[in-house]
Amino acid sequence: MNMPYHPAAAKLIDELSPSNGEQNLGGLLLDAGKLTAAGAERVLQLQKAENLRFGEAAIKLGLIAEADLCQALSQQFSYPYLSPGENHFGPELVAAYQPFGPQVERLRALRSQLMLRWFTAGHKTLTIASINLGDGASYLAANLAVVFSQLGERTLLIDADLRQPRQHVLFNLGNRPGLSDMLAGRAGMSAVTRIPAFLNLSVLTAGAVPPNPSELLSRATSPIKLEDFAQHYDVILMDTPPARASADAVIVAARSGGALLVLRQNHTQLAAAAAFQANLSGAGAALIGTVLNQF
C-alpha cells in the first residue's frame, strides 16, 4: 500500500532518487510504506556515519526486514518476484516465491543452457515432457516460464496437457477457455492470460478437458497454429502429459521441433526414456536434453 502524501516524505524521495529518474532503494522503500520519513532520515544518518549501504543501515536499525530489502531490490533491478502468499499462486512456483534459493539457481543455469542451445538458434517453442505422472514436467515448465520472463523474454506457457492439466491451478487462473477451446475453434487469442505479477509472462491454460485430446492436438486443420503465437513471444514452453500414458507429448514435440525430457531420480526407467527419444526421432523432433528431478 502506498504512503499518503507528506511533504517531508516527498522531499526525502527526491533526495533518495538518482538524477537519471530511476527511483533508488530508499525511494522504493518509502513508496511501499516500509519506511517512514523519520525512519529514512535515521537510515541516512547511520549510512553516512558508518559508510553502509542504505539497505544495510535500515536493517541494522531494525526498520525493515531482509524480505523488504529483497523486494525493493527486485523492483530496482526489474527482477519481479513475490512474497509468500502473494497472488495466491501454487507453492510449487519456487521461481516466484524463492528466487534466491538453490533450486532456482539450477533453473537459471538450465535457462542459460536452453538459450544457448535452442532459443538463440532461431527456435521459439520447446515441449516439456516426462515419462510418468509425478516426474515434474508441469513443475519445471511453470518455473522455467517464470525465470525466462524474469530475463525479459516475452514468455508464453501453454498447458498442452489436455488430460490432467495443472497450470491453471499453479497460476490460480480458474477454469477458463484455453488451448482445447482454441483448437476446436471456440476461442481465439484472447484466451491467453497475462500474468500481471510478471510483466513478460502469459499463460494459455488447457481449457475444457476434451474426450479426444490426441486427435485434437493432431488436427492439421487446426484454426490456431504455433506460428501465430511465435509472432508475439520470444519463448513458448508447452507442458504435456506423461509419455507413458499417451502419445500427446510426441505429437506436441513434432510441432514445436524439440523436447526437454524430465527424469525423476529413482523413478524413471531409462528404457522408457530411450523409447521416448526414438519416438521423437520418428516424429521429426529433437531431444534437446534431459533434466534429472531430484525433488
Could you describe each region identified by the protein language model?
Residues 52-54:
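The conserved glycine-aromatic submotif of the RRM
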